[in-house]
Amino acid sequence: MTINAPAAVLLALYIAVAKEQARAKSSDNGSETRIVHGLRGTVQNDILKEYAARGLYVFPPNHSMRLVTDVFAFCKEHTPQWNTISISGYHIREAGSTAVQEVAFTLANAIAYVQGALEAGLHVDDFAPQLAFFFNAHNDFLEEVAKYRAARRMWAKIMRDRFNAKDPRSWMLRFHTQTGGSTLTAQQPMNNIVRTTIQALASVMGGTQSLHTNGYDEALQLPTQEAARLALRTQQIIANEIGVTDTVDPLGGSHVIEYLTDEIEKRASELIFHIDSMGGAVKAIEAGWMQAQIAESAFRYQTEIEKKERIIVGVNEYGENEQIKSGSRFVVNEEVAKRQHERLQTWRAKRDANQTSALMSQLERVARGSENIMPCLIACVEGGVTVGEIGKVLRKVFGEYRPPTMI
């Protein structure tokens, strides 16, 4: 689930549905526990990159971190196969960071999550094997291959040496990759097929565990069926026809790849050291430092394009003076929104109002305390409290975050 601020609530809904399905299939009291225990999936749950890059946050960082670590602790006990977080460099890169910053800021955020979990009383090997990562695949082929190799090496060292993790699974950087949406151009959109293919190949040769390839027309519109199918076929051809998946780390040993890997590790480690000196990722974000670094890199990248110091084919060179085609307009079906609103009103009217009120009061009490919030969230959704109502209670307790003003 690509969800962050309300990630704990959405996970609670999944668990509630699993329990309901278990009850429907069996009267065995232990069936609910077994089914919940066997749930598999991933919730993105990476709130720090929202403050740093994307902006879809609600609560202040310290309260958001509490929700993240509560998910870690709950899943360790009740859903041990669930991937509790997908720590995301993708959005950081899309906001304009460099490859080095993508690695550094992603791993700095990961360090903050691990430290938060340890401070909450968890043992590192109880939750670290379920941490997952999400990276961008950008245009510089060799740099991208080296980036993944450097990140994997750095994470193993961080977990083994900094956090004293003993389980080799805790050292593993398991990651998903998506080709860079910000690299797609509205001009000559068919060129994006080539860009996406090269980016996908870099991620595969860098060792990604899973991959999303963008549609070539996504700079213009939601992808058409043709574009989505071609994106899928790109992956299938790479996987089945060209042999790159037959060898682990196929570019390992290359002089330039090893040099770039070492250089990215060195420079990213220096950035992490600086973030540590500021008090960690949360402090760096609250000070606006991480955001400012990304903004500066984004400005520099765009300036290079405008000065033709960085060539983008079809944009600032090799143009054909063609008019940019407009994409097909996405039309919102207002009937869908109307029906959902009516369903919500009906739901609220038929539920037990006293029970709902009691559950919301209990949620407020738990949120103000220090006990794990997940059992209460599950009870709330099972009792008919809506996502919006849960959010309202948590806003009342935690407040809403206002970022620092940067000039």
Where do the language-model regions lie?
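A short, flexible low-complexity segment enriched in Lys/Arg and Gly/Pro that occurs
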Residues: 62-66, 166, 180-188, 354-367
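Active-site capping/gating regions of soluble enzymes
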Residues: 88, 104-113, 120, 129-314
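Generic alpha-helical segment signature
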Residues: 7, 61-64, 103, 227, ...
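Charged, alpha-helix-enriched surfaces in structured cytosolic catalytic cores
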Residues: 9, 150, 192-195, 229, ...
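Flexible, glycine-rich loop/tail regions that form catalytic "lids" or insertion modules at the edges
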Residues: 225, 233-236, 240-407
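Generic secondary-structure signature for well-ordered alpha-helical cores
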Residues: 16-19, 23-24, 29-34, 69-81, ...
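Catalytic alpha/beta active-site cores
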Residues: 1-138, 143, 162, 169-176, ...
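A generic structural signal for short
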Residues: 2-3, 59-60, 102, 186-189, ...
